[in-house]
Design a protein with these regions (language model features):
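Residues lining hydrophobic/aromatic ligand-binding pockets adjacent to catalytic sites
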Residues: 1-293
Length: 293
């Protein structure tokens, strides 16, 4: 077996009100959530740029706040104007987003730029033209593409990503008709996986956005992902992001994966050293449906 490259595992985001007193210890006054989590994980996916392009002062601050962890690298979502809501895109947004990325890249703290597209985005010549344009706009940064429609899961599209030097994002999500299925595909500069949970009941029928991400994976459900991650890491530096963030469930599962892959890991805050504490925080048990291995 070839040598395993580095595997960084961590949550999507760090600023959630429902993490207070669970992921983060009870505190008064100022508390640096990012710095705290960077003592437990070597990566975190930055969510906030999806909603608004941050100024470079934000990325410079984030770099400073993880300085105590030499191994730490961020991944970051791209602004939704490039992928979801084109009407929100303004002249100068490419330059503004690159200016935000530069402090991360120059500090050696940028693992990947996540280009996340919705399920409604399907493979077609027009879609590939859209993607090629976007790849060119952010040339020079390590890019990873998340698509969720099954039409993209073909050898021709893998070749397309390899030609452009862009990573495929392997996804775990509820499997509906024409959903992308779990895989261990590696293209581009890094291996990348995102685990969103399997909350079938609330994935589309939710009143609050957090509801679809309220899901705690069992260790049995994570076992196939341990194998996939190990396979991905034979080829590339790999990032694994747990996005089932509600009430810290992403933290528990990130620690589960780290331990299963032989990495030292401990649970932060008041989570305790088992899944019972966080699962008891959920409003109700999530109905289980098996995803294919």
């Amino acid at each position: 077996m070839s040598e395993r490259h580095s595997i960084r595992i961590g949550p999507a985001g760090w600023s959630y009100k429902d993490w207070e007193g669970i992921v983060y210890p009870p505190h008064r006054g100022r508390f640096d959530e990012l710095a705290y989590l960077a003592s437990f994980f070597d990566t975190i996916e930055i969510n906030s740029p999806f909603y608004r392009i941050p100024p470079p002062t934000h990325s410079k601050s984030w770099v400073r706040r993880v300085a105590h962890n030499d191994a730490f690298k961020f991944t970051t979502k791209i602004f939704k104007g490039f992928t979801h809501e084109k009407a929100e895109l303004k002249p100068g947004d490419v330059d503004a987003f690159r200016a935000y990325l530069d402090p991360l890249a120059e500090a050696g703290r940028l693992g990947a730029l996540l280009l996340q597209f919705p399920w409604s985005f399907k493979d077609s010549p027009e879609s590939r033209e859209t993607l090629a344009t976007l790849f060119g706009q952010f040339a020079g940064y390590p890019q990873a593409l998340e698509v969720r429609h099954a039409t993209f899961q073909n050898e021709g599209f893998v070749d397309f990503l390899n030609e452009h030097g862009v990573s495929w994002v392997n996804v775990d999500q509820p499997l509906f008709h024409e959903s992308v299925k779990p895989a261990a595909t590696v293209t581009g500069p890094v291996g990348y996986a995102r685990l969103h949970g399997r909350n079938y009941e609330k994935w589309f029928a939710h009143s609050e956005s957090w509801e679809r991400y309220s899901y705690l994976y069992s260790k049995e459900e994570l076992e196939p992902w341990v194998e996939r991650i190990d396979e991905m890491a034979q080829a590339k530096e790999t990032y694994v992001i747990t996005n089932n963030h509600f009430r810290g469930q992403a933290i528990v599962n990130a620690v589960d994966l780290k331990r299963a892959l032989g990495q030292e890991a401990k649970l932060p805050g008041t989570l305790g050293d088992n899944q019972a504490n966080v699962s008891s925080q959920s409003d109700s048990p999530t109905p289980r449906r098996k995803n294919p291995k």
